Structures are given as structure tokens and as C-alpha cells.
């Protein structure tokens, strides 16, 4: 139960930070480009890399991974987990697997979004 609470608390913080960052970028740059989404994805990727480096050195343990990696970064951006998956594949020398995963994730997510929209429009 303690692990779940760490993830939930981190998720609340990450989601709140994403909301505030999105509002700030909207006010600063306007609605013409998704600067907020791009920003959280880039920040999340950097933060995930920093966290993994700390974890690999043994400077933090499982509670930090759950709170920060799964919780905060999961709430801030799921793109950070995706980026970590791709990096791990590349480090294992699985270039084609990584490229396939990137294509399937990005294209598949957009296709799934349109499928969801289509379903909802047909029942509206």
C-alpha cells in the first residue's frame, strides 16, 4: 500500500506541474503550437535520464523510482517512460525494434485517437 501511495502522490504532483506548465506556455506563446506538450515531453525525457543515472549509481532506491519515475514523471508526461523504453532498446543494440516501437507508438496513438473520435461521433 505504501508503494501505491508514493505513486499516487507523485502522480498528483506531476499532473499539477503539467497543468501549470501548459497554462504558462499558453499565456507566454499563444495557442498556435503545442509548446506545453513539447516542453513537458523534453523536460520529462531529461528528468527520466537524470533519475535513471542516479538509480544506476545506487544513490536512490525503489521508493525514489516509484515516487519520481512512475509518479511525478508519469503524471507530468508519459513520454518520459516511452523515451526510456527506446533508449534501453538502443543501448541493447536493437535499432530496428526501437524504430518499430517508435513508429507503432506514435502512429498507433494518433490512429487510436482518431478511432476514438470516430466512435464517439457515430454515437453522438
Predicted regions and their residues:
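Membrane-interface helix-loop junctions in multi-pass transporters/channels
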Residues: 1-124
Amino acid at each position: 500500500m505504501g508503494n501505491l501511495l508514493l505513486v499516487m502522490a507523485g502522480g498528483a504532483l506531476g499532473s499539477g506541474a503539467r497543468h501549470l506548465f501548459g497554462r504558462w506556455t499558453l499565456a507566454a506563446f499563444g495557442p498556435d503550437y503545442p509548446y506545453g506538450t513539447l516542453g513537458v515531453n523534453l523536460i520529462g525525457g531529461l528528468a527520466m535520464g537524470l533519475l535513471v543515472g542516479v538509480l544506476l549509481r545506487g544513490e536512490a532506491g525503489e521508493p525514489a523510482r516509484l515516487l519520481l519515475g512512475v509518479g511525478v514523471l508519469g503524471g507530468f508526461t508519459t513520454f518520459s517512460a516511452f523515451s526510456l523504453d527506446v533508449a534501453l532498446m538502443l543501448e541493447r543494440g536493437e535499432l530496428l525494434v526501437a524504430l518499430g516501437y517508435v513508429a507503432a507508438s506514435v502512429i498507433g496513438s494518433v490512429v487510436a485517437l482518431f478511432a476514438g473520435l470516430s466512435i464517439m461521433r457515430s454515437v453522438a
